[in-house]
Structure formats: structure tokens, C-alpha cells
Amino acid sequence: MLEGLKEALEHVEELARENEKTEVVEICGHTYANKALRRYDTANYAEPVKATTLSALADYIVNCREEFTEDRRMIIHVVSPTKVRLMSALDGERKREVLFETDAQVSGFRFDQWYDQESFMIGLQANFAKTADLDAVLLLAGNIERKNEQTYSDDGCTQVATMTVGVAAKADAIVPNPVQLRPYRTFQEVEQPVSQFVFRIGDRGTPEFKLVEAEGGIWKTEAVRKIKDYLELVLSEQDMALRNRITIIG
């Protein structure tokens, strides 16, 4: 009985050893293994420097150029209106090393959501660059008052609301639509793209307001172009050797 148990344990050990073996086969010119393998001689890549501004990236390129050697080409990738990366060209491992990454701190304004009067006024002043249309919206929203017997007039294209025009006088005012505004949606170093928004006034007991984007995200393309223009200007002020090593894409 003990002899049989010993043989069984030896058989289990043998199966375990067989299972630990890695089998490598070649099929149609491609090499495969029956286990996931991990290389021990992989290249070491640096952790990217993190920032929130384009000027920080510009400072890094100008002042830390020794971190990317002269024989190493670099790419500035404008990923989106809020993210830019500085990375190397493909290395021998067919990988790219990201040296710098910057993420813009942008407006927290919630489009297509209702705001009460005070929150709307604060949100506009904190999250939008000044424009004539912004002043018009602020003026109207700040002077709207509740109607007791009449709802806001709305024909689908324009709205009419009562606003105060003096100490006690009131007048009907046409709500401007669409309005052209510049919310803070990309890096502060570039001009904020202008976009069209539909300005709506709600009538659920107290005045409420919202802005609805009305151009399908066209501003993103403009923002990326402005970021590229800014970075190209930075590079144009550097020596030819540095300019020739860096490509900007976006």
C-alpha cells in the first residue's frame, strides 16, 4: 500500500515538472510558446514629467534638452485640446518613451444642464473668457424675474422673458440665440476657441438657465491647431539642431 502511494506521489511530481516546462514551437515562420514569457533584459523607461501648462513643456524642451540625446528624434503629440505629450520616436523595441505629459486644467461648467440663477451667473463669470455675447447673457440672466401669470414665450427658435430695466419698470426681452462664447476648454497659453451655444431659460417656478453646445465639437480641431501654432513658435526660437529633431503632430 505504501509502495503504491509512493509511486502515485512520484507520478504527481513528474507531472508538475512537465507542466513547468515551456514548449516553444515554430508554425508558418512564427514562434509560439505555451506559456506567457517575460523578458529580463527590457529597456528601462523614465516616468514622464507631469504638468498642467504648455509653458512648462516649453521650458522642459529648452532647458532639459540633454535628456534626449542628439541622435534621438522626438515627437510632440497634441492628443486633444487638454493633453500634450513629448515622446521619443520608435526605439529598437518598437516602443516610444514618454518624457513629458501636460494636462490642462479647464472649465468645470456643465453644458446642457440647468442652473439656478445665482449658480449660472457665477459659472459664467468663472469659466468663460469675456465676449460681447457673454455680457449680453449675463445682463439678461441677472435681470430675469419670475412671471406669476405668464410662462416664458418660446417658439423653438427664440424665447421672450421679462427682465427689469429700472427700479420698478419691466420689459419683455428676446433671449439672444445662438450666442458665441469662449469657455475655458484648453490651455491658458492659447486663445480659447469660440463656439456657438443655444441659451435656454426654464420656467419651473423660479428662473433657471442652461447652455447647449450647437456646433458638434468643431472647436476641438481649432484648439489643437492653436496648440500646435504655440509650440511651433516656441521651437522657431531655438537653434536649428533642436528644431530638426522635434516633430509636432496633432
Regions found by a protein language model. Give the residues of each.
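Generic N-terminal initiation segments characterized by hydrophobic and/or small/turn-forming residues
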Residues: L2, K6, A51-L54, D71, ...
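Charged, low-complexity surface segments at secondary-structure and domain boundaries
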Residues: R39-A46, A104-F109, A126, V212-G217
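Alpha-helix boundary/N-cap detector
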Residues: E3, P48, T52, F111-Y115, ...
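Long, compositionally biased interface segments
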Residues: V190-G250
